């Protein structure tokens, strides 16, 4: 059974309430599946500009993710998530893949966008698209693929953002989805000599890959 709970967040988000209200983002939780359908990761020969995706059979962690919610969703307010990345080389983005899952309420769709940076936070939209039909939360490892209409040049050493958001009104303003965590966000801990235990980091980094051409 899915659960919602409050946790800390270090990337960026946008809520429908004012910042001074001290809103904190909410997570989605599900029982991870024991059956993993291998992800299809850039079979078209594109190169990796950025990725925190795991191997195809474990591309992301299907048990936890940040909610992506519209203002009319069951959450009662909007919650949008942004993931920063910095290209190592001048590149051209042609495709973005993200681990978005459907949390069982509202229209099964959201808005993905590639954004500029603005003083360390999400800036202006470079290109965006409505993406639909996410796999159910608690399943792995189908990725949501967005092939950009126009290849977008990005500059080495400059921060950009991949953003998952929703419409403020109309179809999709009621969606309750989740951007699942990267498996590369795991760490081991050992308390009082009780043995090593794997756990998710408290940072909760959303899983995604940015692909294209690198001269």
Where do the language-model regions lie?
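Beta-sheet-rich sandwich/jelly-roll-like modules and their strand-loop junctions
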Residues: 22-124, 152-159, 165-215
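Bacterial N-terminal signal peptides
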Residues: 8-16
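Solvent-exposed serine/threonine-rich low-complexity stretches and specific carbohydrate-binding patches
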Residues: 124-137
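Short strand-edge motifs at loop-to-beta-strand transitions and within beta-strands
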Residues: 81-83, 142-146
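Short, conserved secondary-structure segments in the cores of folded domains
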Residues: 148-150
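Positively charged n-region of N-terminal signal peptides that target proteins for export
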Residues: 1-4
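Short, surface-exposed linear segments at secondary-structure transitions and domain or protein termini
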Residues: 134-143, 185-191
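Sec/Tat signal peptide C-region and signal peptidase I cleavage site
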Residues: 17-21
